[in-house]
Every structure is written in structure tokens, then in C-alpha cells.
């Protein structure tokens, strides 16, 4: 069995997923869809980059990461329906996404969370105190962290409002006020 995994080439998490998949399962991976038994549309929104003849003649798995209901009308819904005619199975990372796409397809939907790369996401050897010291952050300071990418992808300027940057800011304001009443400084670390 040979698998071609479609990367969006957007310098985003899906590109890393494809790279990690290909690195860990290289014996199953091919670099061109014509050589594959299965085409994995890990970046499902890029499906039309694959020639239709391959989509018709291969097994196709599409990963749907999430649907934004407010955006899933018109073009996005038409695009989903056009792609659905080629998809044999959907992969989604959570039940919420499964519930969102179920009304739009009769194809099987497999819920499987994304993996975590332990070489990237792990505890630092330094203690929290050592990290605070290295960053010049007082031990008593209350820290709030955010590492999500909140842009639309086609540029790094347009906010991705469904990720709730407004809600994050509201929560930060509330925490800052609460901590100030307690006499504690609060800071936000963005990555």
C-alpha cells in the first residue's frame, strides 16, 4: 500500500504533519499521487491541486480539521460537495467536526485526534524558575500563554476570528483585573 499525502505548502501545521508522517512511515509514502494507492488530502482545502483522474481512480481520505459554520455557506459548501464525490473516507480530529460534516456527506467519518510530536512538545530541562529568571520574569508574576496562529493563512495580517482572539483578549483583561486586585502582576507570553 502506497500513500500520497497532500501538503498545503503554507508553512503551517499541516505541512509539519505531512513531513512527520512521511518521515515516520517512509516505506508507505510516495511523492506523486500517480504512484499512490491512497491519496490523503491532509490539507483538504487544496484537493483541487490533485488531477481529477487520480481522485477518481484512487482511494481518497480527506482530513477536515474544522468547519466554521458562519463561513460554511456558498463557496465552502459547494467546494465540500464537489470534493465529496471523490472522497471515500473522512478523517476528523474530534467529535464536534464529525457532527459538523455528518449532514453533508454519506461517507464514513473516522474520528482520530492528531498526534503530538514528543521531540517538539516536551518539558524543558530547566525548571520553571530558571526559565523565568532567563526571561527576566519575576517569580510572583502570573503568566498567560498563547501559541496559536490566528490568521487566515493566505497572509499573516487577516485575523482568524473563529479562533476567538476577542475572547482571548476579554479573558486576559479579566485576569489582569483580578490579579491587580490581588496585588499580582500578570503578563502575556505569545509564541
Language-model features: where?
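Donor nucleotide-sugar binding/catalytic pocket of nucleotide-sugar-dependent glycosyltransferases
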Residues: 88-100, 106-125, 137, 147
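Membrane-proximal helix-turn-helix segments that form the acceptor-binding/catalytic region
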Residues: 71-90, 104
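Active-site proximal beta-strand in glycosyltransferases
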Residues: 35-43, 53-71, 90-92
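A short helix->loop->beta-strand "cap" motif at the edges of active sites that frequently abuts
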Residues: 55-60, 87-88, 106-108, 184
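Conserved alpha-helical elements of sugar-nucleotide-dependent glycosyltransferases
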Residues: 10-21, 93, 160-171
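Conserved catalytic-core segment of nucleotide-activated headgroup transferases in glycan assembly
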Residues: 124, 128-191
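Short beta-strand segments
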Residues: 5-7, 40-43, 113, 145, ...
